[in-house]
């Protein structure tokens, strides 16, 4: 088991040398910290790679306004494609997920589309949601959900897969699936109790309660609450605090925490040891020591 844990940790850093040339680049007019903007593409899910003072941040934006960003096949196909690009993009140090649609982050699954599916097709679609959110969760760089408006059902399950959740005072979150005689099927029954505890998770899922941002903050469902329209601003602020840090160290820290939470503490210590071993031979570690000695800010390159 120990050899297996160490091998998994070692393999996880090999992607650093892989590059991607398919990521969309943003323009200065396309991002004014969460303000709605126009774009030439008609994509329902848009990936941007920010530049200038926000370099290192990539943003996934949902733009399916006519159905309140409901999760349909086309949107999810685009979402998965963007996640695949980000997974092999060493220049991206933080990912922010947000909505471009006023008043809604994500209203959950597209139930009208779901009604046209056979039982097999419906099961396949739920499986694709579950696997997509796991892909989001296992991105090696930190992820931040900037929540404005409604984020229920699959919308809540999506933000649960992020490392940080920032909710504006316009936000509404919850898992109302039992009211439709189903259960959360894209990770909600597993991630929610791990985040807020079993009793509270059962209460929210059994009752289908919808929470405002204040209550979500109180129970630890989100880490930050902002004024309406400012969730993306806060997400950018958090991202800019992370970006100057050693990118390999950030990835290894995330890996050690995430993997360690799913095993006993002794095994978690082995994961931490193996993760720490990955940062020792890096150029960034030497740069950090040199910068400290020279009393200057370090410049980390992810090497």
UniProtKB/Swiss-Prot annotation:
GO terms for cellular component: mitochondrion. It catalyses: (3S)-3-hydroxy-3-methylglutaryl-CoA = 3-methyl-(2E)-glutaconyl-CoA + H2O. Its EC number is 4.2.1.18. Pathway: Amino-acid degradation; L-leucine degradation; (S)-3-hydroxy-3-methylglutaryl-CoA from 3-isovaleryl-CoA: step 3/3. The keyword Membrane does not apply. It is found in: Mitochondrion. GO terms for biological process: fatty acid beta-oxidation; L-leucine catabolic process. It comes from the Eukaryota. GO terms for molecular function: enoyl-CoA hydratase activity; methylglutaconyl-CoA hydratase activity; mRNA 3'-UTR binding. Keywords: Branched-chain amino acid catabolism, Lyase, Mitochondrion, Transit peptide. The keyword Membrane does not apply. Homohexamer. Belongs to the enoyl-CoA hydratase/isomerase family. This is Methylglutaconyl-CoA hydratase, mitochondrial. It comes from Dictyostelium discoideum.
